UniProtKB/Swiss-Prot annotation:
Post-translational modification: Ser-38 is the major site whereas Thr-27 is the minor site of phosphorylation. Phosphorylation regulates its class-switch recombination activity.
Effect of residue 87 to R: In HIGM2; uncertain significance
Induction description: Negatively regulated by microRNA-155 (miR-155).
Protein name: Single-stranded DNA cytosine deaminase
Modified residues (Phosphothreonine): 27
Length: 198
């Protein structure tokens, strides 16, 4: 685990949702873990991680939370803000982990979509996460503002959007929607068949 708060310049560089993210070879993951008790929730931990020694950050987080003694009788909500969406292998590990821990839910807000040039399996990884109940969305100004005030050593500076933040968020949201769209259509068809008694 690194220091509790991320350096301001590092956050702006790593999380910037630019179309061509040249040189950004690491994934950063800011997280919040909450325990839900009926209508209220309690923050248990927050911080950030990054890839280390060739190990992807998603797997580092799974190792980290596996060391906790999570009460199977309580519900936990984990929220990630990531600089890149998970690769196919990490998505598979996360989905398997969630299946083994049904009392834990995960939301992922990502700055950019990761696509490995040689495999093109990453969209299927995102669909697999979605099927496992993970809520996946692209970061918007509101999410960047929250991260800036929660995870960044900002020295009381106000978060300022860079040129193109909104447009890139919209573009990436549409792309993510197209990736997940087949799932929505299949769910709609299943509901229609059930309604018709087929």
């Amino acid at each position: 685990m690194d220091s509790l708060l991320m350096n301001r310049r590092k956050f702006l560089y790593q999380f910037k949702n630019v179309r061509w993210a040249k040189g950004r070879r690491e994934t950063y993951l800011c997280y919040v873990v909450k325990r839900r008790d009926s209508a209220t929730s309690f923050s248990l931990d927050f911080g950030y991680l990054r890839n280390k020694n060739g190990c992807h950050v998603e797997l580092l987080f799974l190792r980290y939370i596996s060391d906790w003694d999570l009460d199977p009788g309580r519900c936990y909500r984990v929220t990630w803000f990531t600089s890149w969406s998970p690769c196919y292998d990490c998505a598979r590990h996360v989905a398997d982990f969630l299946r083994g821990n049904p009392n834990l839910s995960l939301r992922i807000f990502t700055a950019r979509l990761y696509f490995c040039e040689d495999r093109k399996a990453e969209p299927e990884g995102l669909r697999r996460l979605h099927r496992a109940g993970v809520q996946i969305a692209i970061m918007t100004f509101k999410d960047y503002f929250y991260c800036w005030n929660t995870f960044v050593e900002n020295h009381e500076r106000t978060f300022k959007a860079w040129e193109g933040l909104h447009e890139n968020s919209v573009r990436l949201s549409r792309q993510l929607r197209r990736i997940l769209l087949p799932l929505y259509e299949v769910d709609d068809l299943r509901d229609a068949f059930r309604t018709l008694g087929l």
